[in-house]
Regions:
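A conserved acidic beta->alpha catalytic loop
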Residues: 83-93, 110-111
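Membrane-embedded multi-pass helical conduit in multi-pass membrane proteins
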Residues: 289-366
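Long helical/loop segments within the catalytic core of UDP-sugar-dependent glycosyltransferases
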Residues: 28, 105-130, 153-216, 220-224, ...
Length: 378
């Protein structure tokens, strides 16, 4: 077989896989669970848990949104804020809410113990401080803005489906070029690769998807699974928590959440690079797995685009399948469609560079976030 024949074979394989991925994306778009913004769940105690570290620019808007959502909760509800040794005005700003609103409690976090990472430790302290009578716990990140219907809709989804953990995926706000290239890959990555309804039921670790930006969990199952103590050394603690829930017989997974919450994870290219540098390596488990996944993505979503430029019809089919898959996800999650989806192959290449950067930082021990080295599990 000549080099040309081998190239054409790779193009055909990539295009076929892209078409198959598009089919799965369309299926998931039709079956993806969606919170009902008008839902009114059965009244039960709710505790919202908000870990914050150097979030002075976010905590005010975040708490305003949380309190508006608590107004719509039919049962008793409150929010506990844990200040995780902030060096800015985060604690003072949060304390002002506690003075004005009895539903807000602010506690000071203690230093991260050996063997723990910062966020799992903060969440574990919050959960320990929550009332044991709470029926539902909702973990929220400070860069998330929930809608007034968010907690009622999320709680109703949890109870009506019989699941033990639901992760309504917020709309991912992306403003700069770097954000627009990378952030849409978050929802696309699971909508294009996993059969989501099956993923809810199976205990296979590789089929667990969750997003710690907004997690709604049954309090009893959370404690039975070991809570964040069970995931204390995990960089990607949200997915690890879902796996812990499944390990004790629970069920759960990701749902659409763009109508009830929005999040801008990173503001610009530098923040985006630093954020993925500290965590992306943990998504693969090993360097060889990272190379395999990125290589497969290149074959499926970059090779066809290159071949298309050379006049390959198989390449055109593969490119259009990838772009259409992205468009379906964007339409489903209220993201930006055009012209962003046309740059899908470039997004994949940028993701590959971020993955390499993260793997190098992990190997060198230079992965850091908010002044802390991400070193557990190295």
């Amino acid at each position: 077989m000549s080099a040309t024949d081998r190239w054409q074979a790779v193009v055909r394989v990539g295009a076929a896989l892209a078409v198959g991925s598009l089919g799965l994306t369309a299926r998931n778009a039709m079956t993806l669970r969606r919170p009902d913004p008008d839902a009114v769940p059965h009244p039960e105690p709710l505790v919202v848990l908000l870990p914050v570290r150097d979030e002075a620019s976010n905590v005010v808007e975040c708490l305003d949104a949380i309190l508006a959502a608590l107004d719509r909760w039919p049962g008793p509800g409150r929010v506990i804020v844990l200040d995780d040794e902030s060096a800015d005005d985060t604690a003072e700003l949060a304390a002002g809410y506690a003075v004005r609103d009895a539903r807000v409690e602010v506690i000071a976090g203690t230093p991260t113990p050996q063997g723990w990472l910062g966020k799992p430790w903060a969440c574990a302290q919050l959960a320990r401080h929550a009332e044991t009578t709470a029926g539902i716990l909702i973990f929220v990140d400070a860069d998330v803005r929930v809608q007034p219907c968010a907690f009622a809709a999320g709680g109703a989804l949890l109870r009506d489906t019989g699941l033990d953990l639901v992760s309504p995926y917020p709309r991912q706000r992306a403003d700069t070029v770097a954000e627009r290239l990378i952030q849409p890959l978050l929802q696309w990555s699971w909508m294009s690769t996993l059969p989501l309804r099956l993923a809810e039921r199976t205990a296979r670790p590789s089929m667990s998807v969750a997003n710690g930006q907004l997690l709604v969990v049954d309090a009893g199952v959370y404690r039975r699974a070991g809570g964040h103590h069970a995931v204390r050394a995990e960089v990607i603690e949200d997915i690890a928590l879902l796996r812990a829930v499944k390990a004790v017989g629970g069920r759960g997974g990701v749902t659409e959440g763009s109508q009830i919450a929005e999040c801008r994870m990173y503001t610009g290219a530098v923040a985006l690079r630093d954020g993925y540098r500290k965590s992306l390596w943990a998504a693969f488990g090993s360097s060889s797995a990272a190379v395999a996944v990125v290589g497969l993505l290149v074959v499926v979503h970059v090779v066809p685009a290159i071949a298309m430029v050379g006049g390959s019809r198989a390449g055109l089919v593969g490119y259009l399948a990838g772009v259409t898959s992205r468009a379906v996800v964007a339409a489903t999650t209220h993201g930006r469609i055009w012209p962003d989806v046309a740059a899908h192959p470039i997004s994949i290449l940028a993701f590959g560079l971020l993955t390499a950067d993260s793997m190098i930082a992990r190997r060198r021990g230079t992965a850091r976030w908010k002044g802390r080295t991400v070193a557990v599990g190295r």
